[in-house]
Design a protein with these regions (language model features):
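Extracytoplasmic gate region of multi-pass secondary transporters
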Residues: 35-36, 237-295, 350, 354
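Helix-breaking motifs and short loop linkers at transmembrane-helix boundaries and internal kinks
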Residues: 47, 79, 100-106, 117, ...
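Conserved MFS/SLC helix-loop-helix module at the cytosolic interface between two early adjacent transmembrane helices
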Residues: 66-105
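Cytoplasmic membrane-interface "Motif A"-like loop-to-helix N-cap segments
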Residues: 76-88, 303-316
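Cytoplasmic helix-loop-helix junction between adjacent transmembrane helices
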Residues: 110-147
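Glycine-rich segments within core transmembrane alpha-helices of 12-TM secondary carriers
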Residues: 140-164, 185-186, 374-384
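Symmetry-related core transmembrane helices of the 12-TM Major Facilitator Superfamily/SLC fold
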Residues: 176-195, 402-417
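C-terminal transmembrane helical hairpin of 12-TM major facilitator-type secondary transporters
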Residues: 306-356
């Protein structure tokens, strides 16, 4: 009876929560990386050099870094429904305002403010999922949520490419319409969030009494093994002092450098082979489609075996190989194959990686620790794109920057092996 009840509850959680949070992340990721497509014409209009574009693209993560932890602590206090709704409307408005930048300084400012606006969203959803899904189902839940990122690229790339084919309308150019059109869903979904999200299992009217009782008891039992009697502030400070949190931040730094190097620079790398904006979007979508499939299958295997370490290490190695290959690839076929390695590798690593913090963090400590891992780790999203732009200005090509980012993924793999000796394994999910 317990296995049947568990299966019923997990099925309800899956269909009630995951499709909606995937939609939210789809919109979030599109708004943060569509600048890569805007750059096809925006850079010339604004006079942006590769270094300037890399700096502006990456400076998003400085704002993200500074406001991540406080944003997640507020979410833990006021609830996901209210805070995520606030995050969405703010980032939607800032993203739309990006259409009106007039030069490097305004470009930097709006990208920084977009990072401030989005701070708290990703780790907030990861925290939210940990408050609903039992540990044995957490990697698959995280994978489904994070699959929205490559899915956003797969679907959003052709859409962005098509928008970039638009003629000037009402005095606005193609890249300006790109920012405006793709910002609208975030503002609209803010109102849906207030209706669709439930703050905690205890408030879930859509669960039957026995389902709610089982879920609350299961999650409480898991937390009991991790929580101390420390208060909110003490729990948060303890997490920030935990060396495991710092090491995981460095691991995530490498994967973020790879992910956002792709998001910002892949369209420009593909475009240099002479493709139109629409053709660039179509080719950029191919690796992302495969990444969605790889991410979900890899996460299921991780949950089924209960193993996390090698499920992070091997994809990081594959992604590093792909980036290095892209550095010397001289045909579009080779570039797309290299990007497949990178996309599938980084996407596959993320879900097992994000299943690890909840094995040693809970409560306020989880809110602070997860936010810290995400905020420090996402600084890789600043360093990677900026390194590509700066080294392209210095060397005239993309190779040197791609090799640097590949090295950061190798470091992530080694750090995962080191921290994995502490035993990041959960009980295998029941068959």
């Amino acid at each position: 009876m317990t296995n049947e009840l568990q299966a019923r509850v997990v099925r309800k959680l899956t269909w009630r929560i995951l499709p909606f949070v995937m939609l939210l992340y789809f919109v979030s990721f599109l708004d943060r990386v569509n600048v890569g497509f805007a750059a096809l014409t925006m850079n010339k209009d604004l006079g942006l050099s590769p270094t300037m574009f890399g700096l502006g693209g990456g400076i998003f993560f400085l704002g993200y870094f500074l406001f991540e932890v406080p944003s997640n602590l507020i979410l833990n206090k006021v609830g996901a429904r209210i805070w995520i709704a606030r995050v969405m409307v703010t980032w939607g408005l800032v993203s739309a305002a990006s259409a009106f930048v007039v030069g490097p300084n305004s470009f930097y400012t709006l990208r920084f403010l977009l990072g401030v606006a989005e701070a708290g969203f990703f780790p907030g959803i990861i925290l939210y999922l940990s408050q609903w899904f039992p540990a044995r189902q957490r990697a698959v839940a995280a994978a489904a949520f994070m699959a929205a990122a490559p899915l956003s690229t797969a679907i959003g790339s052709p859409i962005s490419g098509a928008i970039m084919q638009m003629p000037a309308l009402f005095g606005l150019k193609d890249w300006q319409w790109l920012f405006i059109i793709e910002a609208i869903p975030a503002v609209v979904l803010r109102f849906v969030v207030l209706k669709a999200l439930t703050d905690s299992p205890e408030k879930a009217t859509w669960l039957a009494a026995d389902e709610k009782a089982w879920l609350v008891a299961t999650l409480r039992e898991e937390r009991a093994g991790r929580e101390s009697q420390a208060g909110h502030a003490a729990g948060a400070l303890a997490a920030l002092r935990d060396p495991r949190v710092w090491i995981m931040s460095m691991i995530y730094f490498g994967t973020s450098a790879g992910l956002y190097t792709l998001g910002l620079w892949a369209p420009l790398i593909i475009r240099q082979f002479g493709f139109s904006a629409l053709g660039t979007g179509a080719l950029n979508a191919i690796p992302s489609v495969l990444a969605v499939i790889g991410m979900v299958l890899w996460a299921r295997h991780s949950d089924r075996t209960g193993e996390r370490t090698w499920h992070v290490v091997l994809p990081c190695i594959a992604a590093g190989i792909g980036l290095a290959w892209a550095g010397f690839a001289d045909t579009i076929v080779a570039v797309v194959l290299a990007l497949i390695f990178v996309n599938v590798g980084i996407s596959a690593a993320k879900a097992p990686l994000w299943a690890m913090p909840s094995s040693f963090l809970s409560g306020a400590g989880a809110a602070a620790g997860i936010a810290m891992i995400n905020s420090i780790g996402n600084l890789g999203g600043f360093v990677g794109p900026f390194a590509i732009g700066w080294l392209k200005s210095v060397t005239g090509g993309y190779a040197a920057g791609l090799y640097v980012v590949a090295a950061s993924l190798a470091v992530s793999a080694m750090l995962t092996l080191a921290i994995g000796r502490r035993g990041y394994r959960t009980a295998p999910a029941p068959q």
